[in-house]
From Swiss-Prot:
Function in brief: Binds to 23S rRNA. Forms part of two intersubunit bridges in the 70S ribosome.
GO BP annotation list: translation
Ranges that cross the membrane: none
PANTHER family in UniProt: 50S/60S RIBOSOMAL PROTEIN L14/L23, LARGE RIBOSOMAL SUBUNIT PROTEIN UL14M
Taxonomy of the source species: Bacteria, Pseudomonadati, Pseudomonadota, Alphaproteobacteria, Hyphomicrobiales
Family matches, as Gene3D superfamilies: Ribosomal protein L14
Oligomeric and partner information: Part of the 50S ribosomal subunit. Forms a cluster with proteins L3 and L19. In the 70S ribosome, L14 and L19 interact and together make contacts with the 16S rRNA in bridges B5 and B8.
Gene: rplN1
InterPro entries noted in UniProt: Ribosomal_uL14, Ribosomal_uL14_bac-type, Ribosomal_uL14_CS, Ribosomal_uL14_sf
Record-given protein name: Large ribosomal subunit protein uL14
Length: 122
């Protein structure tokens, strides 16, 4: 459950380390984002010689949340930290690698490129 002002880790090699959510896309009154949703983020912390700079405003896909994800079979999946992958306007990842596992729910929300780059799909 991601809302405005939430800090997230970046799970790709785009050059950003931490980002902060500044808007949840998908409706004027929408308050929260979950796995697979697109948010607008501001880059807060970067590594040297990365593709993005501190202060850049970008779009990102939420790939891991600390809040439970309930599945149709009754199982629950949750992660230790919130994480996102930076994407361009065509919803393609900016980085070329994804770090850490991603949930199967991304496949249903048409983020196939992120699923294919991930080392593990839960």
């Amino acid at each position: 459950m991601i809302q405005m002002q939430t800090n997230l880790d970046v799970a790709d090699n785009s050059g950003a380390r931490r980002v902060m959510c500044i808007k949840v896309l998908g409706g004027s009154k929408r308050k929260y984002a979950s796995v697979g949703d697109i948010i607008v983020v501001s880059v807060k912390d970067v590594i040297p010689r990365g593709r993005v700079k501190k202060g850049d405003v970008m779009k990102a896909v939420v790939v891991r949340t600390a809040k439970d994800i309930r599945r149709a079979d009754g199982s629950v999946i949750r992660f230790d930290r919130n994480a996102a992958v930076l994407v361009d306007n065509k919803k393609e990842p900016i980085g070329t690698r994804i770090f850490g596992p991603v949930p199967r729910e991304l496949r249903g929300k048409n983020h196939m490129k992120i699923v294919s780059l991930a080392p593990e799909v839960l």
